[in-house]
Amino acid sequence: MSRMPTDAEIDEMSEEELEVYLGAGPTQELDRRTRRDAGEDLAARPAWLRRSGAERGFGWLLTVCALIGILACWELISAQLDLLRNPDAELVCDVSPLVSCGDSLNVWQGNLLGVPNSFVGAIAFGALAAIGMVLLSGARLPRWMWWGLSAGSLGGIAFVIWFLSVSIMTFGKLCPFCMVIWSVTIPVAAHSWAWAAAGGHLGLRDNLALDVLKVRWWIMAAMYLAVVLTIVIAFGGQ
């Protein structure tokens, strides 16, 4: 059984440690509840005590990637509006015969839900930025939100795979702002799955969830490598 902290030790506690202590009661191990290392926290806690939060670094990753994604979507929306006003307009994303977005904007592949994909993406990235800022505030997410984040990330990766295949087989071109969106979707997905698993929200065994958290950077690198190799193989001869 853990000992009660002294008054002096309580006075020296940080605000976060004090909140944990007051919420845990005297029978819980204070040092265990305030560990910042996710791997140690995962191994030490029983499932019902696991936090549904994450390190602040994950909050920063979500926020920064979301803001970059919003900017890329905004550029695509602006390009589509320019094209609607003037079909012969020179778009900023039409860099070369290989790197261009004009052909993909006003076709059905660029408007899957009846509105521009970039508009849907901007909404999704806006929600992602909000989640990132919530995590930066130190709050913990409920399980349903982790499920939504994991499912949304899976949908994002599915869209990357689909639109990459369309770019290769249908357009024969690469949209630069789309590639920016792909580049931020990949780390969001890899880290979201890892932290959701670490929080016990994906139903994985403890040791497997810890392994997923440890290799999240490798998962991200593998997805980047798959995209790069696909592009090189498809367009390497052009």
Q: Could you tell me what each predicted segment is?
A:
Residues 54-84:
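N-terminal signal-anchor transmembrane alpha helix
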Residues 75, 79-90, 158-185, 234-238:
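Interfacial helix-loop-helix junctions of multi-pass membrane proteins
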Residues 81-116:
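Extracytosolic (periplasmic/ER-lumenal) interhelical loops and adjacent juxtamembrane/interface segments
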